[in-house]
Curated annotation (Swiss-Prot):
SMART domains: POLIIIAc. Keywords: Exonuclease, Hydrolase, Manganese, Metal-binding, Nuclease, Nucleotide-binding, rRNA processing. Mn(2+) 3 binds at E72, H83, H198. It comes from the Bacteria. Exoribonuclease that catalyzes the last steps of 5S, 16S and 23S rRNA 5'-end maturation. Removes 3 nucleotides (nt) from the 5' end of 5S, 16S and 23S rRNA precursors to generate the mature 5' ends. Precursors with longer extensions are not processed (7 nt at the 5' end of pre-23S rRNA or 66 nt at the 5'-end of 16S rRNA are not processed). 5S and 23S rRNA maturation occurs more efficiently and accurately on ribosomal particles as compared to free RNA; the enzyme overdigests free RNA but generates the correct 5'-end in ribosomes from rnm deletion strains. GO terms for biological process: maturation of 5S rRNA; maturation of LSU-rRNA; maturation of SSU-rRNA. This is 5'-3' exoribonuclease Rnm. It comes from Escherichia coli (strain K12). Belongs to the PHP family. TrpH/YciV subfamily. InterPro entries: PHP_dom (IPR004013), PHP_domain (IPR052018), Pol/His_phosphatase_N (IPR003141), Pol/histidinol_Pase-like (IPR016195). The keyword Transport does not apply. Binds 1 Mn(2+) ion per subunit. However, the sequence similarity to CV_1693 from C.violaceum tends to indicate a trinuclear metal center. Pfam families: PHP. The lineage of its organism: Bacteria, Pseudomonadati, Pseudomonadota, Gammaproteobacteria, Enterobacterales.
Length: 293
């Protein structure tokens, strides 16, 4: 990509050490600039703790980066864990702060149960190991996975989920998150836009994926992620068609967690023709009209 248009790269889904990412907020914003991202949303799992230090680093270093405050909220729909991203939220809004505190409590309870199940499977110290890897951030299943790889119980993160953390396995604990409707509501109350995250990753049939998108749209969701780094052209086209069908704006994001060969900030993030980028809702409000959903 040429130097003349790198500033228009939008990456609206990324993680830091505040949840299950491997880079600090400060390191992430520097990497975003290195990767020629012009607008970055930090969307850690059920926490906004990374936003303030990221803002401070951008200001301190004079980085040419537009930071969008965000969050990725864990929900449950039809026994599936579904993630809803909130973009351009007010991270100080009392309702959002209270809501995320409740999510943190749910996350801590789940982590305790996962550790207890692994203990029964002769894998001691999992909670302490996950907490150590979380470095004070939100403890996620990703931290348990890293701990199990570290202990030699599996060869990779994917192997951990296959052996221990997937549905029906030893360390699996059914999620007890909020509903999609509750996530959308708190995002809207905090002034943000609600985005259905990575809809192609939930292992849903075409029929169930359509049901999910319809449910999200019916409850006043704003957008869905259409473009990601690792994605077939066919999937991107299909997701764009679903967005158009349900009058949803389109978003794009790498879901970056750590430097790796196949997922990178800003990589391969573009929208197919016929959909509109969700960033238009806050960048050009004077040209935006409400649409019937």
């Amino acid at each position: 990509m040429s130097d003349t248009n790198y500033a228009v790269i939008y990456d609206l889904h990324s993680h830091t050490t505040a949840s299950d990412g491997c880079l600090t907020p400060e390191a992430l914003v520097h990497r975003a600039v290195e990767m020629r991202v012009g607008t970055l949303a930090i969307t850690d799992h059920d926490t906004t703790a990374a936003i303030a230090p990221a803002r401070e680093e951008i200001s301190r270093s004079g980085l040419a980066l537009n930071l969008i405050p965000g969050v990725e909220i864990s929900t449950v729909w039809e026994n599936h864990e579904i993630h809803i991203v909130g973009l351009n939220i007010d991270i100080t809004h009392p309702l959002m702060c209270e809501f995320l505190a409740q999510q943190t409590e749910r996350r801590n309870q789940r982590a305790q149960l996962i550790a207890e199940r692994l203990e029964k499977a002769q894998i001691p110290g999992a909670l302490e190991g996950a907490q150590r890897l979380a470095q004070g951030g939100a403890v996620t299943r990703g931290h348990f996975a890293r701990f199990l790889v570290e202990c030699g119980k599996a060869s990779s993160m994917a192997d951990v989920f296959k052996k221990y953390l997937a549905r029906g396995k030893t360390g699996y604990v059914p999620p007890q998150w909020c509903t999609i409707e509750q996530a959308i509501d708190v995002i809207h109350h905090s002034g943000g836009k609600a985005v259905l995250a990575h809809p192609g990753r939930y292992n849903l049939s075409a029929k169930w994926l359509k049901r999910l998108v319809a449910h999200f749209a019916e409850h006043h969701g704003d957008a869905m992620e259409v473009a990601q780094c690792q994605q077939s052209p066919n999937e991107r086209t299909q997701l764009a068609a679903l967005a158009r069908q349900h009058h949803l704006w389109a978003s794009q994001g790498s879901d970056f967690h750590q430097p790796c060969p196949w997922i990178e900030l800003g990589r391969k993030l573009w929208l197919p023709a016929g959909v509109e980028g969700v960033w238009q809702l806050w960048e050009q409000p004077q040209n935006t009209t409400e649409r019937e959903l």
